[in-house]
Regions:
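Nucleic acid-binding interface residues in structured DNA/RNA-binding domains
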Residues: 2-116
Length: 116
């Protein structure tokens, strides 16, 4: 299967067959985040049953082979910061602004309305 052919959760699962169980869980949880919403590394870790693995979630997303299909730009730090290097953070900020996510003072303005 080619990356361009991926449309459904089942397609994502098939494409990620060579990833670890943890990486698949992280990427599938991230795949579910809708446009205009964000989650945090901590929330993803909790969602997949590994509540203390937020750094490992970040590492798995850093190796995301399906960006932007699996929208890792929608996962931010618990303080609304973008994380990563300055260039990557700026690109993520622009993508999120384009999707209608509120940004204030260089961070996502986290609220129950946009948290997934």
């Amino acid at each position: 299967m080619e990356k361009e052919e991926i449309k459904t959760k089942e397609d994502v699962i098939r494409f990620l067959k060579d990833k670890t169980e943890f990486e698949r869980a992280v990427l599938l949880a991230t795949f579910e985040i809708p446009k205009g919403k964000v989650s945090t590394y901590k929330r993803i870790a909790e969602k997949i049953g590994k509540p203390h693995a937020h750094r490992a979630v970040g590492n798995a997303l850093h190796k995301n082979p399906l960006a932007p299909i699996v929208p890792c730009h929608r996962v931010v730090r618990s303080d609304g910061g973008f994380g990563g290097d300055k260039k990557g953070a700026e690109a993520r900020r622009k993508l999120l602004e384009k999707e209608g996510v509120p940004i204030e003072r260089g961070r996502v303005k986290l609220s129950k309305d946009i948290l997934f």
